[in-house]
Amino acid sequence: MAAARVLLLLSGRPESVSFAQSVCGLLGAGSGLGPWPTHCGLKRGQLVLSDKPFPGASARLPLQRPPFCPFAALDQQPRAPGVELPPKGRGVDLGVAVILQSSDQTVLLTRRTSTLNISPNLWVPPGGHVEPDEELLDGGLRELWEESGLQLPQGQFSWVPLGLWESAYPPKLSWGLPKYHHIVLYLLVISQESQQQLQARIQPNAGEVSAFMWLGPDIAAAVAATEDGTETPKHLPQDLPSSVPTVELKENGGAQPLALPTSTLLRTTPGTADSRERVSTGTKFALTLWLQHLGRKSRDGS
């Protein structure tokens, strides 16, 4: 089944986006770092975006891209002769990722296996493509179940859309021309179960996941602060633990605890193709949005 598409409301009607076009650029993003507030219609199997309010818009979300977004770079430079991107008929795909929060305020990240063609060894939240006939939340919950084995009982979770990320792979032009172009919708799904209760039910899909971990706000803040593409790293707390508890899958199908060096999670995207494990840039953005959500809830007293 064909992947769902991202549509933009540019001249009064929804239009598909060509693969090579920068979605942020089409929506009026300048040369700044963003994010840019974007009006969204969250429809079955598709996402309609506009920089202005429109009938049917159900949310206003921050849209962001990395400072080194290859589509933004391609917008600024002439295409060299013989340089080919995917066919003009191919659009921008829609992905969804679930930031699963336990009742004790930790979130689940999974490490993609080293054998995957796209983004191997990256730490990301569970997620993937939305099918054309799926509600976006249903697509996120399906991906959560397929990757982690977790099914959340109806009535025992709440959810809210967090933000949008323009994603490319390879992530930098210095790695090669992009072959994949997505808008990823990050959904915060808040479970009524604790981390311990959720962990007892996790059954990771070894074809996609090689390890998983739960991050609390302190480590998440440090990870989110290591912004890819910045010249000077932000000041990091001196009291960060040297390692983070992780569960790694073994080749025989079992699992074992692993103390992952915290420094691994603080790596940024290198200038040349590299499959060393790190947290994806989009995930850092999503963690920032999650921490902002926690802060608002704390101020509201809820």
UniProtKB/Swiss-Prot annotation:
This is m7GpppN-mRNA hydrolase NUDT17. CDD domains: NUDIX_Nudt17 (cd04694). It comes from the Eukaryota. Belongs to the Nudix hydrolase family. PANTHER family: NUCLEOSIDE DIPHOSPHATE-LINKED MOIETY X MOTIF 17 (PTHR42904:SF1), NUDIX HYDROLASE, NUDC SUBFAMILY (PTHR42904). GO terms for biological process: NAD catabolic process; NADH metabolic process; NADP catabolic process. Coiled coil: none annotated. GO terms for molecular function: metal ion binding; NADH pyrophosphatase activity. Acts as a decapping enzyme capable of hydrolyzing monomethylated capped RNAs (in vitro). Hydrolyzes monomethylated capped RNA after alpha and beta phosphates to form N(7)-methyl-GDP. Shows low activity towards unmethylated capped RNA. It is an enzyme of class 3 (hydrolase). It catalyses: a 5'-end (N(7)-methyl 5'-triphosphoguanosine)-ribonucleoside in mRNA + H2O = N(7)-methyl-GDP + a 5'-end phospho-ribonucleoside in mRNA + 2 H(+). One of its GO terms (cellular component) is peroxisome. Pfam families: NUDIX. Keywords: Hydrolase, Magnesium, Manganese, Metal-binding. It comes from Bos taurus (Bovine). Its cofactor is Mg(2+); Mn(2+). InterPro entries: NAD-cap_RNA_hydrolase_NudC, NUDIX_hydrolase-like_dom_sf, NUDIX_hydrolase_dom, Nudt17_dom. Mg(2+) binds at E143, E147. SUPFAM superfamilies: Nudix (SSF55811). Its EC number is 3.6.1.62. Residues 89-237 form the Nudix hydrolase domain. A motif (Nudix box) lies at residues 128-149.
